[in-house]
């Protein structure tokens, strides 16, 4: 049973570290392998601790859930890590050199995560009913949907060949460049002497697919990604219950196999260099990152921990129901308190061990429902399997050698699943309510808008045709530069505005706090009569 739970988790565990390390250090195979191994090891250790509940001496509080509830690296923090690391990597010293290396940027995010994780620790001592009132389904659902929407865009970029070359392809061959190519002008006749959209129509080549280097969106990349989706459908049609619960890892391995036997102009999609170079065993702390603090990421991270707090309560409720336990009992309240404390402490410990924040995984509730086994021993065995898979770094070598397009086919499915989960949460709210519809429309409108057009608040495409949201140098400030404090405030606001679920969740929380109930809007008093 433990292995079955581990298989249900592995696909989701490897994606966040894989994507973040691609952002931070590019194609460094050793760093990718380490990050994946670290995610598996830490998730295994924390799952064991979470399943085995501990009393805190001298208090009425506990640590851990005491049920079959697993912990894993959270998708919710991925967009913030991407945005913050990208912002730090874009900073330069006076001589034009990079201010932060990828490892330094990641280290700063780890330090900031340690500080922000204390919020969830504090919230673990707040009664769950108060948390539910503060963050109802309409707010939590918006947050989860926008996490999924933003990440799905990242998944599609990987499916087409890679996230970096996708950005360059859009920059060089975007819709506006098409206008220029047809005889249009960038600025119009009033602006002269300004070069048209940069890039000159050159192709953006993707280098994250083994020895194969082709333009973004090449048919070979699309086909390999589609092989993963095809296997997902086949498993759902013909697979056993066990296979359906392990559909992510089965489809990923199938796509990996297809890529392994495929060639493009004699070049391999899966060379064995990364597997051969991987050490036999590894563990956390093998790699070091200079721990720091990045102020601009604080508010987005705090919002993320608020969201995971409410998600954890919902996940534990689902676990109790799948385990056929009473959700109105004192034991459930104790599990919620211990689970939230476990989430916060383990996220702190994960950052201390160079990993990303952890939270409860909901997909394992399906395994419980199908197998009718809710024993904590299965959770402990699951944790041991995850640790074993992480320690055997050849496993990480195999995973890191997967072509970006194969990973993209899987992550598009996984990330959109997050969106669907949020949709399920929102559906529990009264969507006939005028108040809820306004909250949903405004927060989702802005959040999805930022997902579709992220450069509205910042010149992320590097084009001469968009104004920087808050310029720190250049013609919009007539050569003036921001001081350190102003730049920090600017970067913090920019990360908040360009991370879809941060701005969307903040709007939903604000509207929930200030909008009157429908009864008050239409002029009825609380006892049902006209006011």
Language model features: what each stretch is:
Residues 21-64, 300-376:
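Membrane-embedded helical hairpins/re-entrant loop segments and their flanking transmembrane helices
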Residues 238-253, 275-293, 297-301, 314-341, ...:
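Hydrophobic, small-residue-rich membrane helices and short re-entrant helix-turn-helix hairpins
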Residues 1-13, 214-228, 245-247, 260-264, ...:
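Hydrophobic, membrane-embedded alpha-helices of multi-pass small-molecule transporters
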Residues 46-47, 75, 185-189, 193-207, ...:
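P-loop potassium selectivity filter motif centered on the GYG triad
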Residues 30-37, 59-77, 133-140, 243-249, ...:
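Short, non-helical or kinked segments that cap or interrupt transmembrane helices
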Residues 1-68, 75-84, 88-99:
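N-terminal signal-anchor module of multipass membrane proteins
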Residues 84-91, 98-265, 381-529:
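Membrane-embedded alpha-helical modules
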Residues 2-6, 66, 109, 113, ...:
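Hydrophobic alpha-helical transmembrane segments of multi-pass small-molecule transporters/permeases
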């Amino acid at each position: 049973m433990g292995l079955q739970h581990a298989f249900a988790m592995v696909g989701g565990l490897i994606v966040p570290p894989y994507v973040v390390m691609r952002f931070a250090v590019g194609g460094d195979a050793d760093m990718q392998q380490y990050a994946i191994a670290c995610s598996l090891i830490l998730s295994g250790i924390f799952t064991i601790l979470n399943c085995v509940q501990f009393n805190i001496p001298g208090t009425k509080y506990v640590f851990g859930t005491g049920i079959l509830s697993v912990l894993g690296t959270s998708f919710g923090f991925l967009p913030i890590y991407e945005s913050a690391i990208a912002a730090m990597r874009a900073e330069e010293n006076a001589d034009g050199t990079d201010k932060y290396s990828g490892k330094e940027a990641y280290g700063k995010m780890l330090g900031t995560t340690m500080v922000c994780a204390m919020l969830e620790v504090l919230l673990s001592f707040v009664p769950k009913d108060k948390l539910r009132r503060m963050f109802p389904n309409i707010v939590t659902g918006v947050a989860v949907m926008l996490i999924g929407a933003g990440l799905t865009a990242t998944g599609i970029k990987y499916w087409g060949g890679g996230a970096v070359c996708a950005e360059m392809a859009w920059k060089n061959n975007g819709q506006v460049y098409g206008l220029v190519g047809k005889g249009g002008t960038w600025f119009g006749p009033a602006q002269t002497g300004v070069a048209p959209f940069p890039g000159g129509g050159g192709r953006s080549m993707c280098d994250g697919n083994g020895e194969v280097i082709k333009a973004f969106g090449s048919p070979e990349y699309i086909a390999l990604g589609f092989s993963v989706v095809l296997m997902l459908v086949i498993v759902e049609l013909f697979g056993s219950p066990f296979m359906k619960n392990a559909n992510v890892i089965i489809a990923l391995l199938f796509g990996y196999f297809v890529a392994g036997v495929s060639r493009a102009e004699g070049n391999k999609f899966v060379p064995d260099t990364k597997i051969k170079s991987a050490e036999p065993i590894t563990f956390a702390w093998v790699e070091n990152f200079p721990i720091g603090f990045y102020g601009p990421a604080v508010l987005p991270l705090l919002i993320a921990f608020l969201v995971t707090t409410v998600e954890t309560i919902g996940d534990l409720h689902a676990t109790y129901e799948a385990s056929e336990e009473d959700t109105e009992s004192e034991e459930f309240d104790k599990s919620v308190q211990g689970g939230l404390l476990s989430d916060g402490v383990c996220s702190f410990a994960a950052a201390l061990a160079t990993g990303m924040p952890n939270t409860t995984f909901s997909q394992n509730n399906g395994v419980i429902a199908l197998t009718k086994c809710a024993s904590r021993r299965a959770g402990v065995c699951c944790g041991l399997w995850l640790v074993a898979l992480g320690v055997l770094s050849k496993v990480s070598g195999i995973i890191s050698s997967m072509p970006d397009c194969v990973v993209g086919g899987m992550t598009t499915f996984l990330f959109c699943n997050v969106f669907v989960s949020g949709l399920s949460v929102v559906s529990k709210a009264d969507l006939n309510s005028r108040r809820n519809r306004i909250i949903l429309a405004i927060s989702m409108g802005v959040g999805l808008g930022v997902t579709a057009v992220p450069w509205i608040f910042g010149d992320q495409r590097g084009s001469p045709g968009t104004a920087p949201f808050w310029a720190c140098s250049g013609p919009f400030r007539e050569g003036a530069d921001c001081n350190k404090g102003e730049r920090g405030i600017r970067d913090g606001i920019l990360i908040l505005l360009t991370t879809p679920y941060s701005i969307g969740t903040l709007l939903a929380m604000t509207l929930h706090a200030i909008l009157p109930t429908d009864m008050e809007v239409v002029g009825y008093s609380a006892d049902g009569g006209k006011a």
